[in-house]
Amino acid sequence: MAANNEDAANYLAADEQFEDEAYDSPSPTTSTSYATSIQSYIREGVEENGRKYPSYGRNLYGLPIDEEEQERNEVQHTKFKLIIGDRLHLAPVRQLPSNILDLGTGSGIWAIEAADKYESAIVTGVDIAPVQPTWIPANCRFEVLDIEDNWMFAENSFDYIHARELIMAIRDWDRLIKQAYDHLRPGAYLELGATYPTPTSDDGSLRPDMYLKEVERLFFEMAEAMNASLHAPTLWKEKMERAGFVDVRQNIFK
């Protein structure tokens, strides 16, 4: 779940209070016009069957981005914290980190709580949908970014990269993990988390003919049709090690 990087990478984008050390340096004019041009249509999204879906990103994303989904996202956040002992993460973040990145930040709740916890750091949450709140800690920011594209951050810049529940969003995990590796400072950590969508029961009471198992089958079928493998978490450790991470640890909870 967490991995240590021996050979790493630089990052950030600042508001007026903070020094920008994380972005590669596009001109201010280019950055501003880009942000303005994408903002109008990505905020609206695409409506389908009464739900709102993202209109930005190179690949189809199968989950909505509306208010109902943001509420589910926050319940999911609470679930993760309870599972790992009321913590935000398992990886050992260095003292006084300066830059933290949250991939696929969703409602932004993890990034906001991380910014409150690590006041020394600028915590940046990125997502294809700008659905995050505007009232946030001064050291927290949100950016629109498709993390399957090239990242616009300088290499060797992050003290910690966090990603959770991205199995419906990522097609090329090798590329994502390698980009994370390249953007981490030496000794920094990447932490990936996901719910493996295969319900089981210790006592055998969950039979193959039950509706819950049918939901599982349809979920996997849908994901495969989108070319998003739900089996990805079982391969993360191997992919991290192949990218160059060391001290890779896998934690399984039920």
PLM regions and their residue ranges:
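N-terminal charged/capping segments associated with class I S-adenosyl-L-methionine
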Residues: 2-156, 175, 194-206, 211-214, ...
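Short, surface-exposed basic-aromatic patches at helix termini and helix-loop junctions that form
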Residues: 115-117, 182, 240-241
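A generic structural signal for alpha->beta connector loops
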Residues: 120, 139, 187, 245-247
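Voltage-sensor-like transmembrane helices and their cytoplasmic interface
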Residues: 122, 130, 162-165, 188
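A short SAM/SAH-binding and catalytic strip from SAM-dependent methyltransferases
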Residues: 148, 157-174
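Conserved catalytic/acceptor-binding region of the Class I
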Residues: 168, 189-254
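A short glycine-rich, Lys/Arg-flanked "PGG" loop and its adjoining helix->strand segment in the class I
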Residues: 174-189
